């Protein structure tokens, strides 16, 4: 609703800072009130380690990090990649992603803010390069068909699909099946004593 939207836009700090910092493997991540960050910090580290292991980076890869949020995964894997491009819908999150790269001395990341299906196009791929690896961590609704189509066009060697909704993840995997096979699956219990789970899937080009 417009009322809820107005509340979201209004922001007032009554005391203290307007952000917090999370740390992971010596990296510091600034997180603001409008930015997405995993609520279970300890398990978030395990989740991102699984994603990084599945990516199989050697230092030569161009990586696309879709739905990058505050750039946590992008910056986390940047030391093992040649370059990482992160895309996220929320502009404030992308500003935090850029700050996070700067405060950690990371110079091989590039971030874009906007609707995924509008930014990630064939023209974008042609301009910035075909990714060797795509890491995608979409919201519960999963990926838009247009995004899936561009991923299939780009044909990265590996896709690491992180999901908080196995149902929409399964739907998207079915769409990717025309060119990709599932090589590994690793659930991560982000929310103990609930039915929710984060699921990480590694896909490789057939």
Predicted regions and their residues:
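Rossmann-like S-adenosyl-L-methionine
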Residues: 5-206
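Blade-terminus and WD-like Trp-Asp/Gly-His loop motifs, strongest in beta-propeller folds
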Residues: 1-2
